[in-house]
């Protein structure tokens, strides 16, 4: 009988949801939903120094915003936070101590640092040397008594089989193996404060929750042999492992770093800017996985149906902000107007632009928006001073036929009554200028667009002129004529 599919996303509540962690959650979610399995959220909060108040809520809230749901979590199940499972960890610590597979270590941080310094100076690979090495039982007992009398609190270390080979078939990477002698010696499984270390607790949790597959970033590859040692020591079967490739900056080719200020890296940032969650979901799903074919826009249901762990990439995934913006624009263009207008209203209100023209402005600029917050800079023309022209725009306006076009079009606008000044009547006036002057194409439309809006590209020109208003459009044209004549 096939083993039930149970996967987990296990964040530490140490801050906002990073794009890399969101990808880990999303791939586990897709894997579970595709195979009809169980998706679990577990909170790994044993690192008390880095614990952030509200970090757990932020993680779950942003996962929900992306469109993920889960079957088990701290919200519905007891003891799904590591801090609630200390008794369980202690049970297995005691078992390993009793079986002689682990021992209490009284070496101090200062002694460890001094030994590490000595090893580095000698050109040796830093590793822990068993402090009891060469001691008789009497010497060992005396050493422990002396240390305890000095008030030194011990850690607990797992005894490492130096000659052991720890290998697994990775879902993504293929066969991987480590030699026990290259792990760095016996390692700490319980800290002085009584909390377990990550590599110990995660094994207890995964076994207790019957996790079948562990899908995570390849920065965890070095953790896997240590975890396999714990499985071996406790006589448990390990789950299958899959390690996704790193996410790199598409511009630098280096690992995505918090110093990459040209890239938004936290899901909260995308929420605040008004990206649509389904666009971000779609984009993240393609970071290191490809369903095949040329299509790139997929609904959540389509991604669940198409997901195939065998198509997870062995090469680093390039985070391309421009591609995300293109994808986001596609989603916004195709979204219901009412939804986009509702999302745009808070940005317009904050900017003092929630006027009677707001609905029409959102309709006008919806096809251009990469994120909904762009509605504010896109509508600057209607609420701010005329923008300064770029070099390319000044070059267009230096054309010898530009004054002829602008004078003719200004005259057309001045001749229109308020009743005649509606969107559908503006384009015929531009065509009339073409007929009168013989000027057409870019030489006709571009000077009018730049004179009115200050930009070479934008929404339909008649819509822009109508929303700007007849008087303001005439004023902009007059100002431009004064500049170029």
From Swiss-Prot:
ATP binds at residue 258. CDD domains: GluRS_core. Keywords: Aminoacyl-tRNA synthetase, ATP-binding, Cytoplasm, Ligase, Nucleotide-binding, Protein biosynthesis. Pfam families: Anticodon_2, tRNA-synt_1c. A motif ('HIGH' region) lies at residues 11-21. NCBIfam families: gltX_bact (TIGR00464). One of its GO terms (molecular function) is glutamate-tRNA ligase activity. It catalyses: tRNA(Glu) + L-glutamate + ATP = L-glutamyl-tRNA(Glu) + AMP + diphosphate. SUPFAM superfamilies: An anticodon-binding domain of class I aminoacyl-tRNA synthetases, Nucleotidylyl transferase. PROSITE patterns: AA_TRNA_LIGASE_I. This is Glutamate--tRNA ligase. Its main location: cytoplasm. Catalyzes the attachment of glutamate to tRNA(Glu) in a two-step reaction: glutamate is first activated by ATP to form Glu-AMP and then transferred to the acceptor end of tRNA(Glu). Signal peptide: none annotated. Its EC number is 6.1.1.17. The keyword Transferase does not apply. Belongs to the class-I aminoacyl-tRNA synthetase family. Glutamate--tRNA ligase type 1 subfamily. A motif ('KMSKS' region) lies at residues 255-259. The lineage of its organism: Bacteria, Bacillati, Bacillota, Bacilli, Lactobacillales. It is found in: Cytoplasm. It is an enzyme of class 6 (ligase). GO terms for biological process: glutamyl-tRNA aminoacylation.
């Amino acid at each position: 009988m096939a083993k039930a599919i149970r996967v987990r996303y296990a964040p530490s509540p140490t801050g906002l949801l990073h794009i890399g962690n969101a990808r880990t959650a999303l791939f586990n979610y897709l894997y579970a939903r595709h195979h009809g399995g169980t998706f679990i959220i577990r909170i790994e909060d044993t690192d008390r120094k880095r614990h952030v108040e509200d970090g757990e809520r932020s993680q779950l809230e942003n996962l929900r915003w992306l469109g993920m749901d889960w079957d088990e979590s701290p919200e519905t199940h007891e003891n799904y936070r590591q801090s609630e499972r200390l008794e369980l960890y202690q049970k297995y610590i005691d078992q390993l101590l009793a079986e002689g597979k682990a021992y209490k270590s009284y070496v101090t941080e200062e002694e460890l640092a001094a030994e590490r310094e000595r090893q580095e100076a000698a050109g040796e690979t830093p590793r822990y040397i068993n402090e009891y090495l060469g001691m008789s039982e009497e010497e060992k007992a005396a050493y422990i008594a002396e240390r305890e009398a000095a008030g030194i609190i011990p850690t607990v270390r797992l005894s490492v089989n130096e000659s052991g080979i720890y290998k697994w078939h990775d879902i993504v990477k293929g066969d991987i193996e480590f030699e026990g002698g290259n792990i760095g010696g016996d390692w700490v499984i319980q800290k002085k404060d009584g909390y377990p270390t990550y590599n110990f607790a995660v094994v207890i949790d995964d076994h207790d929750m019957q996790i079948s597959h562990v899908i995570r970033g390849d920065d965890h590859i070095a953790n896997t042999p240590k975890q396999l040692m714990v499985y071996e020591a406790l006589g448990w079967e390990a789950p299958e492992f899959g390690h996704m490739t790193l996410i790199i900056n598409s511009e630098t080719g280096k690992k995505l770093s918090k110093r990459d200020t040209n890239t938004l890296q936290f899901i909260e940032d995308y929420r605040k800017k008004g990206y649509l969650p389904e666009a971000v979901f779609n984009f993240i799903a393609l970071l290191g996985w490809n369903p095949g074919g040329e299509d790139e826009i997929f609904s959540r249901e389509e991604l669940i149906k198409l997901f195939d762990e065998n198509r997870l990439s062995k090469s680093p995934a390039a985070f391309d902000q421009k591609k995300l913006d293109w994808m986001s624009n596609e989603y916004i263009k195709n979204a219901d107007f009412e939804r986009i207008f509702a999302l745009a209203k808070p940005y317009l209100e904050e900017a003092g632009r929630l006027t009677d023209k707001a609905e029409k402005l959102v309709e006008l600029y919806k096809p251009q928006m990469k994120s909904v917050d762009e509605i504010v800079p896109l509508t600057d023309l209607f609420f701010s001073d005329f923008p300064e022209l770029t070099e390319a725009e000044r070059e267009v306006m230096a054309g010898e036929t530009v004054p002829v076009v602008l004078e003719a079009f200004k005259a057309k606008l001045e001749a229109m009554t308020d009743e005649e000044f509606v969107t559908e009547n503006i384009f015929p006036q531009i065509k009339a200028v073409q007929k009168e002057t013989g000027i057409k194409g870019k030489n006709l439309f571009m000077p009018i667009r730049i004179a009115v809006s200050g930009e070479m590209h934008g929404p339909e020109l008649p819509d822009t002129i109508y929303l700007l208003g007849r008087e303001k459009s005439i004023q902009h044209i007059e100002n431009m004529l004064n500049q170029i004549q």
